[in-house]
Design a protein with these regions (language model features):
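Short aromatic/basic micro-patch
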Residues: 1-2, 22, 52, 57, ...
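Short, small-residue-biased leader/transition segments that mark boundaries at the very start
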Residues: 1-9
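Residues embedded in well-ordered beta-strands
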Residues: 21, 52, 138, 220, ...
Length: 281
């Protein structure tokens, strides 16, 4: 299949409309020698076979076609006197969050049964290869210094709206004496990406291979165990935690690079972690 060609699985799984783009085979340098030891050494990886990857993260609506009871809940505001729980996270088009790795894999299994295709989570090799889309930088669109406003939904000036006060909470004014105590999260105050929380997939620019929100919006589970580099397929199955890749609306760009890794236990449900799926030939 041609790079960037599209496939939709609506015809095979009634009620589930998901668009996929073709990711080619190839080789690249994975990881980085700058920064934390958990993503070094930089080392060559080969992606032997092309695959299809979901162009956006799995939404609440898509996830509920298989798990109708799923509740992404809300994002808690930074204040104490609440009459409501916070900002909504359950809108149908928002990416599903608080999905454990085990639930994400169960979703893949059910979707495989419905479609007759091999649906799964990407390995972290497949994820980084697809994210980079031919780029060798910190982001598919540039470096840590690039204004990410039109490319990814990361921690920008809108995050200051998490600082609210009042019984029916409203964002604090910058002159409020409490303001500095509730706007402590690392963020790029000079960048405006238009949104505070996770939003419907596809609202920002796609990378060169047609994938949206790879480094922002919500972070994403991979199928891989969290083990020291260099990555080795033979040692998979020996770790207890699973690798999560990409940044989120709540992450500073430094924690959202093409090579940045974080990990959680397979049963953990995390407020800024969702997933996207791949289809293997």
């Amino acid at each position: 299949g041609l790079v960037g060609s599209e496939m939709c699985i609506r015809d095979r799984a009634p009620g589930v409309k998901m668009n996929f783009v073709r990711i080619p085979a190839g080789s690249f340098v994975m990881g980085s020698n700058r920064g934390y030891s958990d993503y070094s050494p930089a080392h060559k990886q080969v992606v032997k076979k092309g695959f299809w990857m979901g162009e956006i993260e799995v939404s609440n609506e898509q996830f509920r076609t298989i798990f109708p009871e799923h509740d992404s809940r809300f994002i808690r505001q930074l204040w104490k006197d609440h009459v409501h729980e916070g900002y909504p996270a359950n809108n149908p088009e928002q990416p599903a969050i608080r999905v454990s790795w085990e639930e994400a894999m169960a979703f893949c299994k059910k979707l495989s049964e419905k479609t007759g295709k091999t649906v799964t989570l990407p390995t972290e090799v497949q994820w980084e290869w697809a994210c980079r889309a031919g780029s060798d930088g910190e982001f598919w669109y540039g470096s840590l210094n690039t204004d990410f406003g039109k490319f990814e939904n990361l921690a920008d000036k809108h995050l200051n709206q998490m600082a609210v006060r009042g019984v029916n909470p409203m964002p604090m004014r910058e002159t409020d004496p409490w303001y500095k105590y509730y706007t402590y999260q690392p963020k790029e105050n000079g960048v405006d990406d238009g949104n505070m929380l996770m939003v419907k997939g596809g609202g920002y620019q796609a990378n060169a291979w047609g994938l949206y929100d790879m480094q922002g919006n919500v972070a994403e589970w991979t199928s891989s165990d969290y083990l020291p580099y260099p990555y080795n397929e033979k040692t998979q199955g020996m770790g207890t935690e699973k690798v999560v890749r990409g940044g989120s609306w709540n992450d500073h760009p430094k924690a959202s690079t093409t090579y940045y890794r974080r990990s959680y236990l397979p049963w953990q449900k995390v407020y800024n972690v969702g997933f996207r799926v791949i289809i293997e030939d």
